From Swiss-Prot:
It comes from Oryza sativa subsp. japonica. Probable thiol-disulfide oxidoreductase that may be involved in the redox regulation of a number of cytosolic enzymes. This is Thioredoxin H2-2. Residues 1-20 are annotated as: Disordered. GO terms for cellular component: cytoplasm. Residues 3-130 form the Thioredoxin domain. The lineage of its organism: Eukaryota, Viridiplantae, Streptophyta, Embryophyta, Tracheophyta.
Length: 134
């Protein structure tokens, strides 16, 4: 019976960071500063940051959907930040739970999704990308 529950409630393994994913995994403050500087001032570019942790089951559960969104929404930039590696960046964005997805336009937070809420995240990404189109 123990194996039944572990099978039912164990999230899938995290997908590999390699491959064709458009998600930019940020592992250093210098890389974050460079990426943030390159994208923050564009008022039409949606930035989506996935604040997660390797030990977070819900983070691993939603990761394939996040990568899929990054592939489908080419007009947005998708970042993944491990809160244990870049705790200062997570603190700056007031991340208190994982996963937290922060949506940014023109350098300002426009929305946030806390938890592995794939449908809500996709709806918000779609909404803010659509609002960029003129």
């Amino acid at each position: 019976m123990g194996s039944f529950f572990s099978t039912m409630f164990t999230p899938p393994p995290a997908a590999d960071d390699g491959g064709d994913s458009r998600v930019v995994a940020v592992h250093s403050t210098a890389t974050w500063d460079e990426q943030w500087g390159a994208h923050k001032s564009n008022p039409n570019k949606l930035i989506v940051i996935d604040f997660s942790a390797t030990w977070c089951g819900p983070c691993r559960f939603i990761e394939p959907a996040f990568k899929d969104m990054a592939g489908r929404f080419a007009d947005a930039v998708f970042f993944k930040i491990d809160v244990d590696e870049l705790s200062e960046v997570a603190r700056q964005w007031k991340v208190e739970a994982m996963p937290t997805f922060v949506l940014i336009k023109g350098g300002k937070e426009v929305s946030r999704v806390v938890g592995a809420k794939k449908d809500e995240l996709e709806r918000k990404v779609n909404m803010f990308i659509s609002s960029s189109s003129s």
